[in-house]
Amino acid sequence: VYKRQDIVRLPVADQQKHGLVVSLSADDFVVNDTVPYLENRGVKGYFETRKLPLVVKEVKGKKAFHFEGTQVYTSSFMLPATLQDNAPYTLEAWVLNDSISENECVADFTTSHDELEKIMLVNGTEPRCGVINHYGWYEDAGYKDMKELAGKWQHIYICFDGRMEQVYINGKLVSEKDIQLLVKPSQFITLGRNAEGDWPFTGYLHSLKLWDEYLPLKE
């Protein structure tokens, strides 16, 4: 008797785009609030501290979460399947870093750590990978003049359509490359360090957003 092999399919919900996946903003809080939990305004869930809680400060006209290198948060939700493999994505953040080290991780959206499996927002002076790190080589992007941005607000905007990735800082295109990613299923998202617990971030985060779609920067 012929038996039909069942085709393994992801649940339909996993194949539908979420749009906004991660959305955090210090504007949701009052200055001097201590926040052990950050409610996510994208997909359902929250971020919880694994160590010390963040304190909300006001810095140069913006409310911001103050990272001192000791705060690490992880999400209660997995990275959606819509961001796996070579899927399009858009990432936006407002960051201020008083003293920019070589490698500091603001947010690691992935828990895998093989080549091209990372989407990691960094804020470092490393010219090869100091803005976005995919655990590639050519595929990563840095900014040679990053040190000049110390103590200033940086509007970081990164968009990838499945082929070309553009990286903007304060509206200036600092990288544009033809790349391919191999993002694997990821158990959680990490704030303040990478998933391996390295590259502590010391600075201020006003807001962070991640979409599972390509949204070119509007002029």
Question: Model features per residue range: what roles?
Answer:
Residues 84-86, 148-151, 182-184:
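Surface-exposed coil/turn segments at beta-strand junctions on protein surfaces, enriched
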Residues 20-21, 153, 186, 205:
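Core-facing hydrophobic residues within beta-strands of well-ordered domains
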Residues 77, 130-155:
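Short, aromatic/His-centered strand-loop micro-motif at the edge of beta-sheets
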Residues 152-166:
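Localized edge beta-strand/strand-to-loop motifs within extracellular or lumenal beta-rich domains
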Residues 1-2:
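Short, small-residue-biased leader/transition segments that mark boundaries at the very start
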Residues 59, 176-205:
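Flexible glycan-contacting loops in extracellular carbohydrate-active proteins
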Residues 17-21, 25-50, 54-62, 66-130, ...:
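Extracellular glycan-recognition modules
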